[in-house]
Amino acid sequence: MKTIGGKVFRHAAILAACVLPLWCQPALAERIKDLASIQGVRSNQLIGYGIVVGLDNTGDQTTQTPFTTQAMSNMLSQLGVNLTQEQSQKLQLKNVAAAMVTANLPSFSRPGQPIDVTVSSMGNAKSLRGGTLLMTQLKGADGQVYAIAQGNVLVGGVGASSGGSKVTVNHLSAGRIPGGATVERAVPTAVGQGGVVYYELANSDFGTVQKVVDAINRTAGAGTAQAVDGRRMVVKVPEDADSRVSFLGRIENLDVQPVAGVAKVVINPRTGSVVMNQKVTLDACAVAHGSLSVVVDAGQPQFGQAADIQVKQDNGSLMNVKAGANLADVVKALNALGANPLDLLAILQAMKAAGALRADLEVI
């Protein structure tokens, strides 16, 4: 007999008991570089279409992936090997796979600097393990080539198959090449032009913005920093490039104690995950939730015999959920319901609708 259901949500109580002493202490200070970033200083995404060769009969089935044979034919013609259209269509390349190559171009990257790339199969290749990515142009959103990638693909997974059975550990159709691309073109990044830079918080909060401004003004002098809104602040910087870099380095390492964020519960219906911060509280309420399970007979199938499938629904009794003033109380109250994570998602949404859950509910 197989029963479809989740594990009971009692692990959360253990987690809360372990981390609660940390939350009872005052909030720790964080560096400005951990809270905010300079506007315009960011990475840029690159993408390219490449070919992985050297696979051990685990490449694309070229009869089902015509773009692989077309790419190989184009590459061979550039190398002086010309094939007729009929020859190109008859290519059977079990050791070749078409792949998309992606990378992030860090800010201030200069030509000649190596960057990591990710190689992902886009056809029906079984594995990229042991393959080599041939020279691939990586382009930005503007269509310009910013890096060239090539190298051996490192795949963290492993797999084997025999006699119709197959075992796979981790993912085999994607891998990485550490330092596999070389930057060919730099992206201009203007910092401090006009004598000011703009800092942007990762999360909007008026209180934290004001604390960052106060910390900068205490160190660099009154009027150096000024809040713009709940996310941005403007900071006056030296005109000289060397002095500007030194000044920003000191500013980024200043300690600031951020204001506690809003109470929030994040749930993922696909995995049954529930995460909440320490500001979540509960008002007293009553909850009744029936448990639904599906039972499938796992016996040997016989021709002409219908499968034995049963749907069972337990009677949910009305339970009193006590008010909780801190995370430990909230977890204890929810754990008392005895609901599995999937049921808990529906309970939390109903609590929010009833006004008993004092937190923002976010579904990802």
UniProtKB/Swiss-Prot annotation:
Q: Pfam families from the xrefs?
A: FlgI (PF02119)
Source domain of life is: Bacteria
Give GO terms for biological process: bacterial-type flagellum-dependent cell motility
| GO (cellular component) term, any one | outer membrane-bounded periplasmic space
Keyword annotations from UniProtKB, A to Z: Bacterial flagellum, Periplasm, Signal
- Signal sequence, renumbered to the chain: 1-29
Picking any one GO molecular function of the record gives:
structural molecule activity
State the compartments where it is located: Periplasm; Bacterial flagellum basal body
Under the heading InterPro entries, the entry gives: Flag_FlgI (IPR001782)
HAMAP family with a match to the protein in the record:
FlgI (MF_00416)
Question: Which NCBIfam families does the entry mention?
Answer: PRK05303.1
Write out the function statement from the record: Assembles around the rod to form the L-ring and probably protects the motor/basal body from shearing forces during rotation.
Q: How does it assemble?
A: The basal body constitutes a major portion of the flagellar organelle and consists of four rings (L,P,S, and M) mounted on a central rod.
Q: What is this protein called?
A: Flagellar P-ring protein
Taxonomy, top ranks, is: Bacteria, Pseudomonadati, Pseudomonadota, Betaproteobacteria, Rhodocyclales
Record gene name = flgI
